[in-house]
Regions:
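Fe-S ferredoxin-like electron-transfer domains
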Residues: 2-17, 73-74, 82-238, 243-244, ...
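Short structural boundary motif marking the start of a folded domain
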Residues: 25-31
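Short coil/turn motifs at beta-sheet boundaries
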Residues: 24, 68-70, 281
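ABC-family P-loop ATPase nucleotide-binding domain
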Residues: 16-25
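Short glycine-centered, acidic/aromatic-flanked micro-motifs in structured strand/loop junctions
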Residues: 33-35, 225
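N-terminal cofactor/phosphate-binding cores enriched in small/glycine residues
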Residues: 29, 36-95
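Short, intrinsically disordered, charge-balanced linker/junction segments flanking boundaries
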Residues: 277-285
Length: 285
């Protein structure tokens, strides 16, 4: 007797949950910027809205690839109905918002911020910041001559509230000796404006190394390695991202620092390149 054939049936395909309906795109937002009506994308920041219209709002701590931290306060603008000036780099636009980017109140605030920076920080290798000082008529010299520079390690050893009160005769500064503890990078914190770009680039926004962070409080706040150890003993992988985002030259390649000191640095011979490699700052090519 011929056996009956055996039939194999493929199992039914697994059931899939119904696809979620697509969310409709948010409607554009109508705002008024410096007296001119504008329509911008929902969720855009005031800074993005201004730049799409060709308005120049200055920034120091902002970078498109980093999370806004609102620390420099140079990008503040005036918003109708708001008691305080708001940071344009992080404040999203709202329907009906009226924004002033260059009012007298805004200019006075930016001038004050720039005066405090220029009177306490060495901006000699930050031409962009120097241009802003001139643009807003800041007069850092009115705060008095610079106070004495801190001795090596003095600022690192300070504790909150334990430093001497200024006498008002001189402008307190962050001047201090350059840190040179390796053959690749130098750290000149006398030029640091605490924009936090290096901390973010070393952290979750780029490298995820977390070799540097902010230490101290108030005027004694500073960028430091963990435990204030020398850079070679820290978690630093020498990727160069911190140097790439530093706006003032506080973090610099040692070769550039040495060439500047010897008067051999030629800015016109420098060039930039676009890359997707997180280690491009190492200089493999």
């Amino acid at each position: 007797v011929k056996p009956a054939p055996i039939w194999f049936e493929s199992p039914p395909p697994p059931s899939r949950p119904p696809a979620a309906p697509e969310r409709p795109a948010a409607a554009p937002v109508d705002v008024v910027i410096d007296g001119e009506p504008a329509t911008v994308a929902a969720g855009a920041t005031i800074l993005e809205a201004c730049r799409t219209r060709g308005l120049d709002v200055p920034t120091l701590c902002f970078l498109e690839t980093l999370t806004p931290v609102n620390v420099c306060r140079v990008c503040v603008v005036e918003v109708a109905g708001s008691r305080a000036l708001v940071p344009a780099c992080s404040r999203p636009v709202e329907p009906g918002m009226t924004i002033l980017t260059d009012s007298e109140r805004v200019r006075l605030s930016r001038r004050m911020v720039l005066e405090l920076l220029a009177s306490s920080v060495d901006l000699s290798t930050a031409p962009g910041v120097g241009d802003l000082v001139a643009r807003y008529g800041a007069r850092p010299e009115r705060h008095g001559p610079p106070a004495r520079a801190a001795a090596r390690g003095e600022r690192d050893a300070r504790e909150p509230g334990h430093h001497e009160a200024p006498d008002g005769a001189a402008a307190e500064t962050v001047a201090q000796p350059v840190k040179v503890d390796n053959d690749l990078y130098i750290r000149d914190y006398g030029k640091c404006i605490l924009c936090y770009k290096c901390v973010e680039a070393c952290g979750v926004d780029a490298q995820n190394t977390f070799a540097i962070a902010v230490a101290g409080r108030g005027f004694d706040a500073r960028i430091s390695t963990e435990g204030d150890v020398p850079l070679p003993d820290s978690a630093c992988v020498y990727c160069g991202n911190c140097i790439g985002v530093c706006p003032t030259g506080a973090l610099m390649f040692k070769r550039e620092h040495d060439m500047r000191a010897a008067g051999q640095w030629d800015e016109a011979r420098q060039h930039t390149a676009d890359t997707i490699c997180a280690y491009c700052g190492v200089g493999c090519t």
